[in-house]
Design a protein with these regions (language model features):
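Conserved aromatic-histidine-acidic binding/catalytic patches
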Residues: 4, 8, 44, 62
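General structural signal for alpha-helix termini and helix-helix connectors
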Residues: 40-43, 58-61, 92
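Phosphate-binding glycine-rich loops and adjacent basic patches that engage nucleotide phosphates
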Residues: 16-19, 30-40, 64-73
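Short, charged surface segments at domain edges that flank catalytic/cofactor-binding sites
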Residues: 1-19, 94-98
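A detector for short metal-coordination/catalytic motifs
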Residues: 64-119
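Histidine-centered nuclease catalytic patch
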Residues: 21-54
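Short Cys/His-centered divalent metal-binding micro-motifs
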Residues: 24-28, 52-79
C-alpha cells in the first residue's frame, strides 16, 4: 500500500491536470493533491479511479474535501449510478490482498508510462 498510494495519486494528477475539482482553482506542487470523495481510511474504494480527483490543499485538508460540492460535481461527471456504487462498495468488508496491490501498482505504472509516451 505504501507504494500504491503515491502511484495512484500521480496517475490521478496526470489524468485530471491541475484544476481543483471542487473549487476550480489552479493548483501546483504541494498544493495539488489527490482528494477522495469517500475518505480513504480503511476504504475498499481508496484506489478506485472514480473516487479520486485533483483537489487543492485548501479544499482537501482545511475543508475536509468539501464533500457536498465533491458529490454534486462527481454525479455530473460519472453519473448517479456510479456514485451510488462507490457508496455501496465503500461499506463492504475488505482486506488488501498482496497480488491485488501488485496488480494495481503495475496497472498505474503502465498507464503513466503510456501517457508519457503519448505526450
Amino acid at each position: 500500500q505504501n507504494t500504491l498510494g503515491p502511484i495512484c495519486a500521480n496517475y490521478i494528477k496526470a489524468v485530471y491536470g491541475s484544476e481543483c475539482f471542487t473549487c476550480g482553482k489552479r493548483c501546483e506542487g504541494r498544493d495539488r493533491q489527490a482528494g477522495h470523495f469517500i475518505p480513504r481510511t480503511y476504504s475498499p474504494v481508496k484506489y478506485n479511479e472514480d473516487n479520486v480527483r485533483v483537489q487543492c490543499s485548501r479544499c482537501n485538508e482545511f475543508y475536509a474535501g468539501k464533500p457536498v460540492e465533491y458529490e454534486r460535481k462527481l454525479r455530473l461527471q460519472i453519473g448517479d449510478e456510479a456514485v451510488e456504487n462507490l457508496k455501496r462498495e465503500s461499506t463492504k468488508a475488505w482486506k488488501w490482498e498482496r497480488q491485488w496491490l501488485i496488480d494495481k501498482i503495475l496497472y498505474y505504472r503502465q498507464a503513466l508510462k503510456e501517457r508519457e509516451e503519448a505526450a
